[in-house]
From Swiss-Prot:
Belongs to the retroviral Pol polyprotein family. One of its GO terms (cellular component) is viral nucleocapsid. The gene is pol. The keyword Methyltransferase does not apply. Mg(2+) 1 binds at D652, D727, D728. GO terms for molecular function: aspartic-type endopeptidase activity; DNA binding; DNA-directed DNA polymerase activity; RNA stem-loop binding; RNA-directed DNA polymerase activity; RNA-DNA hybrid ribonuclease activity; structural constituent of virion; zinc ion binding. It comes from Bovine leukemia virus (isolate Australian). This is Gag-Pro-Pol polyprotein.
Length: 1416
């Protein structure tokens, strides 16, 4: 507001002192500025920091402020000191009949009018909000209240209308009325005496103060307005209804009553309060009551229905209800009424405080309208009738008191003993009542009725009466309001008694509940029954065991709202079974009656033997529970029981979970309702006193409770082994005597703790001991039952899921491989309907036969501590089968089946590593021992090749296990030979990374309608052309399959010129092919490959003009593909003159072999003279044989970069560099950087650009032994490879710059190269040899002499040298960064730090002069 700071005081000063300082600052002349308030706040901080105490008027005088440091703060302190020192003294003597109040010196600055006042302005909404925020929790008329309003008045100079607006905004209606009364009285007292400038003839003070030139008269009105607040009568502060929230220990009824009182005090008269309280009674209730109302759909219901719904809810700290009397020789006195709420103000009759107007002594009451209806005396009202006051409870009568008073004073002890006793439960007080009457049902002669001393009349449900009973409508006023359509009056006599023999009382009329919900014994019967109402002492249920200390942590300590799940109906058979189960649990002490919140449904389940089992559905409670980790990871591995402990005994505990008690605060989460037949009687509610079965944390809590007793037994018999899981205990000992002694000790110890040992389930050796569904023998472990695989197609989904679940359980103890399991699991894919019928394929039925054979080997050996652990890893395309065994054992220890983690192709070596790691973890957890040796079914050559060529970082992990890994082939020794019944694909052949000397060679090729092959070994053995489908790719596959079928089963070298077939075969070489067959013809390829013991796969270019034998034989295969025209043959051979000379068609044998080339436009442009070798199109047949180079342009921001791209024509490996300028020097620098990445090529093929044809570039290539040739650009047979690479790189650059617009060009190009070389290329093309890790050139040592070579020294600067964040494609770049290449013979590297030792020469050609500054 204006120039004033916030009214919130800073640290080190009270609110009243701070407001005094602010008001004193308002007297400064000229008016205070924001800097004055800042200086004032800085002064308070300085005072509090230096004096180590808060600022007060006595300690912070003008002398406490250093002059010149805090501006005009000394003037503010002087003004405050002057005003408070000159305040008026104590008031004079008062009237003799009233004692003057004690005088206290004022702590508030008096009202002043000195100084220049601000001009009048209307209130802004933000100013009104700030004022209300400052005084929101302050009492009206308090010091902070007065001073806050005074500061607001000094700054805005409000008119009476503005002050009235402010009063309506900040005060309640009650306070507004009291303030207006006080203000009117103050104006009337001051108007005739002390008001200066007031003329009664000109209007009222309010009207005159509103004038613009009112001046001092408005200031006087403002002072009277403030004084009226100060003169308000003191009254207790009423909590506003907007801030009322139900407390944690407050019942819902008390909360609603308190809300109604606050609404009555804070809302003006005539405002309807029912809609407001209906909404606030839910919005401000606590979460527990809100959830009850939400669950019953009563959020928008009237208050009465809400009170009725939450009637049974009680806070957790709530004490039991007030009793009429407690057991003992003496009965307590009368119940004291609840204290009345004090009045908010003085009585409007006598204007005195301390009493309500209805209790005012000056209130005059008129005579009664008629005689008293009881004694017929016309002089008094009925409430003052002496006859009514003298009636006793024992006499009864129609005018019974509102509460049942104690009868100790009116009866002797002998008379009390003759009275009937009504024992009441603490939660729902009920008593058995015997009824008789003409309108009752014959079966309702005895019933259980609720005792309610607050109900005036007795209530019966309508279903207890006959249909045609005499009735009249009744309007009943209850907690939910007036009910007009629910209750009727039964106009007929009804006889009641507490005992069959009487005494009986007769009631002329009684209320009937048409909703059949209530059966209540009201005050009209209780006052005449001549009975004593008492609450008996609590009868505790029997103590359960010695473990009476409940667990301190069960996962519900955060106390969420208990669930309210309704009980679903049950048929008569299940209901009778449930009642019997509840009765037995109640007798055993596992449950007890419950009347608190919470409910979870219950139902019985019939066991296979015909008995019933109690099931409590605690899923909602489990969802609210925080899980407790179990001590054991799961069922123990019984094969870990050592063989040197032959004596075994098994114990079983009965009702083990029911020995752990539960605290009372958690019982609401385990409550349930026992329904009655037909709902004719009230449902009974119970709650568990012990851990129930079905609770998520019951197993973990039981294990923790049983941990210490079992630990003591294990410590006493250290030479034995104790294995336990839940309530099953297995004890293994070396001798018979020790087993007997341990069993007796453990059984006695458990019985002392309250556990019951089931002696009928105790088993011991020499017979097999059953434990956890398995049989423990002396040397082995078997399963008690195995699934029967009598499966026929079709089969239902439920049956197949059951069989797979049983197979999963026994798969650890039987040699079930992953392949047949995967076949059955694959039949479940895509099935959503639970009623679906599945048709099994013949292969799946064959897998079932394999599983049936595997289940016949139901045995596992027990662990022998003297022998090492061995493992076998069997890898298949469906998954892995892992075996743990020991040497000399009859059976393995365990089988494990692990499926593929995903559908992506994974190398066999990686799967082997994962299998070894899984087996190691199982061995450590079960046997606490590491595995000595791993056997596997992979060929050693295939595994070695993966280790040498893979870039996976997990290769290092496999190398650490390499001394322990051994290839066992496909038939390992041991009892699991049935695991491998057939050879797995691509695991039998031994693939060779290099050509096999003196081996048979197979060359194959294909066209659109024909495939061909030839076999060669020192000479041509066989050749043939076979028909193929309408596809060149399938034609190549057909030629390869025909050649494999014709080749004898011996080592074979395969040469193909198809990139597709080469990639496929190389994938098989590395053992990375795990995908399903995409083409059925590949199955023939698999079988053909398995016939050869060793295979090498090579790639040859079909359009190569090289003179080596491999290219010649490949050209011969091309001749085996007869084509219709020479042009088709010319297109197939790509202008290969040597292949054209072998045209096989005799009809055109007389043709000139150069005729197709003469007619070909491409050949004419490339080789117009017909013999120039420099223009011949070639592609390399090995890495770094032939490169292609090109320069393309890329625009980024305001620069246009020249991208120098170099591509190896054999593998497609690429390097590129970005240069600002396009000169011969930059082209040489780009070639040098490519050599660093890819190695030195033998040949370089470029277009006919000026940079490539310059003498400098040609001379550079000659010095480094690089053969340079040129071609016509944009020719599909020549430069298509480098042109496509240009497009890919520019596309990747655009992507990275679109993702990061400010990415530097060097980083973007590095990412594009990494993406192209590492992702776009096939993995089989990325071996270490093929990624051009050429041997590094000789490096000059720092201590040696600098070589003296050519006078031409070409310097280059690699990208990323000065950028640490750059991530390049290869480590070789980091190793070679920061160097120079010296053009000597041979060339050598010069480290960058040694370049200063000699003069670095550069090219001095004329074309390099403009770019001399950018070189190097």
């Amino acid at each position: 507001m204006g120039n004033s700071p916030s009214y919130n005081p800073p640290a080190g000063i009270s609110p009243s002192d701070w407001l005094n300082l602010l008001q004193s600052a308002q007297r400064l002349n000229p008016r205070p500025s924001p800097s004055d308030f800042t200086d004032l706040k800085n002064y308070i901080h300085w005072f509090h920091k230096t004096q180590k105490k808060p600022w007060t008027f006595t300690s912070g005088g003008p002398a406490s402020c250093p002059p010149g440091k805090f501006g005009r703060v000394p003037l503010v302190l002087a003004t405050l000191n002057e005003v408070l020192s000159n305040d008026e003294g104590a008031p004079g003597a008062s009237a003799p009949e009233e004692q003057p109040p004690p005088y206290d010196p004022p702590a508030v600055l008096p009202i002043i009018s000195e100084g220049n006042r601000n001009r009048h302005r209307a209130w802004a909404l933000r100013e009104l909000q700030d004022i209300k925020k400052e005084i929101e929790n302050k009492a009206p008329g308090s010091q902070v209240w007065i001073q806050t309003l005074r500061l607001a008045i000094l700054q805005a100079d409000p008119t009476p209308a503005d002050l009235e607006q402010l009063c309506q905004y900040i005060a309640s209606p009650v306070d507004q009325t009291a303030h207006m009364t006080s203000l009117t009285a103050a104006i009337a007292a001051e108007a005739a005496n002390t008001l200066q400038g007031f003329n009664p003839q000109n209007g009222t003070l309010t009207q005159q103060s509103a004038q613009p030139n009112a001046g001092d008269l408005r200031s006087q009105y403002q002072n009277l307005w403030l004084q009226a607040w100060k003169n308000l009568p003191t009254r207790p502060s009423v909590q506003p209804w907007s801030t009322i929230v139900q407390g944690p220990a407050e019942s819902y009824v008390e909360f609603v009553n308190r809300l109604q009182i606050s609404l009555a005090d804070n809302l003006p008269d005539g405002v309807p309060k029912e809609p407001i309280i209906d909404s606030l009674s839910y919005a401000n209730a606590n979460k527990e009551c809100q959830q009850i109302l939400q669950g019953r759909g009563l959020v928008a219901a009237p208050v009465g229905q809400k009170l009725q719904a939450c009637a049974h809810w009680a806070p957790k700290t709530k004490q039991p209800a007030i009793l009429v009397h407690t057991p003992g020789p003496k009965m307590p006195g009368p119940r004291q009424p609840a204290p009345k709420r004090p009045p908010p103000g003085p009585c409007y009759r006598c204007l005195k405080e301390g009493h309500w107007a209805r209790d005012c002594p000056t209130k005059t009451t008129g005579p009664p309208p008629g005689p008293c209806p009881i004694c017929k005396d016309p002089s008094h009202w009925k409430r003052d009738c002496p006859t009514l006051k003298s009636k006793k409870l024992i006499e009864g009568g129609p005018s019974a008191p509102q509460i049942i008073t104690p009868i100790t004073d009116s009866l002797s002890e002998a008379e009390l003993e003759c009275l009937l006793s009504i024992p009441l439960a603490r939660s729902r007080p009920s008593v058995a009542v015997y009824l008789s009457g003409p309108w009752l049902q014959p079966s309702q002669n005895q019933a259980l009725m609720l005792v309610d001393t607050g109900a005036e009349n007795t209530v019966l449900p309508q279903n207890w009466l006959v249909r045609d009973y005499p009735r009249t409508p009744a309007a009943v006023l209850g907690a939910g309001g007036i009910s007009r359509n629910r209750y009727n009056w039964l106009q007929g006599p009804l006889t009641l008694a507490l005992k069959p023999e009487g005494p009986f009382i007769t009631i002329p009329k009684i209320l009937v509940d048409t909703f059949d919900k209530w059966q209540i014994l009201g005050r009209d019967v209780l006052s005449r029954l001549q009975a004593s109402i008492s609450i008996p002492e609590e009868v505790h249920p029997p103590v359960v065991g010695v473990l009476d200390a409940p667990p301190s942590h069960i996962g519900l300590e955060h106390l969420p709202p208990p669930p309210e799940v309704p009980q679903f109906p049950l048929n008569l058979e299940r209901l009778q079974a449930l009642q019997d189960l509840v009765h037995r649990s109640l007798e055993a002490g596992y449950i007890s009656p419950w009347d608190g919140p919470g409910n979870n449904p219950v139902f019985p389940v019939r066991k296979p033997n015909g008995a019933w089992r109690f099931v409590h559905d605690l899923r909602v409670t489990n969802a609210l529970t925080k899980p407790i980790p179990a001590l054991s990871p799961g069922p123990p591995d019984l094969t870990a029981i050592p063989t040197h402990l032959p004596h075994i005994i098994c114990l079983d505990l009965k009702d083990a979970f029911f020995q752990i008690p539960v605290e009372d605060r958690f019982r609401s989460y385990f409550a349930f309702t026992l329904p009655t037949p037909g709902g004719l009687q009230p449902h009974r509610r119970f709650a568990w006193r012990v851990l129930p079965q079905g609770f998520i944390n019951s197993p973990a809590l039981f294990e923790r409770a049983l941990q210490e007793p079992l630990r003591q037994v294990s410590a006493a018999f250290s030479q034995s082994l104790l294995v336990s899981y839940m309530d099953d205990i297995l004890y293994v000992s070396p001798t018979e005597e020790q087993r007997l002694q341990c069993y007796q000790t453990m059984a006695a110890h458990l019985r002392d703790l309250g556990f019951q040992v089931a002696s009928e389930k105790t088993r011991q050796t020499p017979s097999p001991v059953p434990f956890l569904g398995q049989m423990v023998h002396e040397r082995m472990v078997t399963y008690q039952s195995l699934p029967t695989l009598q499966i026929s197609s079709p089969i239902s989904l439920h049956q197949l899921q059951t069989v797979l679940g049983d197979l999963q359980w026994v798969s650890r103890g039987t040699p079930t491989t992953r392949r047949p399991l995967q076949l059955l699991y694959s039949s479940l894919k895509g099935i959503d309907d639970p009623r679906a019928i599945i048709h099994l394929s013949p292969e799946q039925q064959q897998g079932i036969a394999e599983l049936r054979q595997a289940l016949s080997h139901n045995a596992r050996s027990r662990y022998n501590e003297q022998e090492p652990l061995l493992a076998y890893v069997h890898l298949t395309r469906a998954g892995s089968t892992l075996v743990l065994f020991q040497k000399g054992a009859q059976f393995p220890l365990a089988y494990f089946q692990t499926p593929l983690t995903d559908n992506q192709a994974s190398p066999w070596g990686l799967l082997l590593l994962l299998g070894c790691q899984y087996l190691q973890a199982q061995a450590l957890s079960s046997y606490a021992k590491t595995i000595l040796k791993y056997y596997h079914n992979l060929p050693k050559t295939s595994l070695d090749n993966w280790i040498q060529s893979s870039e996976d970082p997990r290769v290092q992990e496999l190398l650490q296990l390499w001394p322990q890994i051994s290839s066992q082939g496909i038939q390992p020794p041991g009892p699991w030979k049935t695991l491998v019944t057939r050879a797995e694909v691509f695991l039998t052949p031994q693939f060779s990374p290099e050509p096999i000397p003196a081996a048979l060679c197979l060359f194959s090729d294909g066209a659109a309608r024909r495939g061909a092959y030839c076999l060669w070994k020192d000479h041509l053995l066989d050749f043939q052309a076979v028909p193929a489908p309408e596809s060149a790719q399938k034609g190549e596959l057909a030629g390869l399959l025909a050649g494999l079928a014709a080749a004898p089963p011996e080592p074979l070298n395969i040469w193909v010129d198809s990139k597709y077939l080469y990639s496929l075969l190389r994938t098989l070489v590395l053992g990375a092919w795990l995908q399903p067959d995409p083409v059925p013809s590949y199955a023939l390829l698999y079988k053909s490959l398995l016939r050869h013991p060793a295979i090498f796969v090579g790639h040859v270019r079909s359009h190569s003009s090289a003179s080596h034998p491999i290219a010649s034989l490949n050209n011969y295969v091309d001749q085996l593909l007869p084509l219709e025209t020479p042009e088709q043959w010319h297109k197939l051979t790509h202008c290969n003159s040597r292949a054209l000379s072998r045209w096989p068609n005799p009809r055109i044998s007389a043709w000139d072999p150069r005729s197709p080339a003469t007619l070909c436009e491409t050949c004419q442009r490339l080789n117009p003279t017909g013999g120039g070798k420099m223009r011949t199109i070639q592609r390399g047949w090995a890495p770094n044989h032939i490169w292609q180079a090109d320069i393309t342009h890329y625009k980024y921001k305001q620069f246009t970069y020249a991208l120098h791209v170099f591509v190896d024509t054999y593998s497609g490996a690429t390097h590129a560099s970005a240069k600002r300028g396009l000169t011969t020097q930059t082209t040489i620098e780009g070639l040098l950087e490519a050599i660093v990445h890819l190695g030195r090529p033998k040949k370089l093929n470029t277009d006919q650009g000026a940079n490539y044809t310059s003498k400098t570039f040609v001379r550079f290539c000659q010095q480094f032994g690089i053969s340079l040739s040129h071609h016509v650009p944009y020719n599909p047979t020549s430069s298509g490879l480098v042109e496509r690479t240009n497009g890919l790189l520019k596309l990747l650059l655009s992507k990275y710059h679109l993702d990061e617009p400010h990415l530097p060009m060097t980083q973007a190009l590095s990412r594009a190269l990494w993406t192209h070389n590492q992702i776009n290329l096939l993995p089989i093309l990325k071996t270490r040899w093929e990624l051009h890790h050429s041997p590094p050139l000789a490096v000059i040592s720092e201590g040696g002499e600098t070589p003296k070579g050519s006078d031409k020294l070409f310097l280059y600067k690699l990208p990323g040298q000065n950028n640490r964040r750059w991530l390049g494609p290869l480590p070789a770049l980091v190793e070679a960064s920061g160097g120079a290449l010296l053009a000597t013979n041979p060339p050598v590297w010069v480290p960058w730090r040694l370049l200063k030792a000699f003069k670095c020469l550069k090219n001095d050609g004329p074309e390099d002069a403009p770019n001399r500054s950018s070189d190097g």
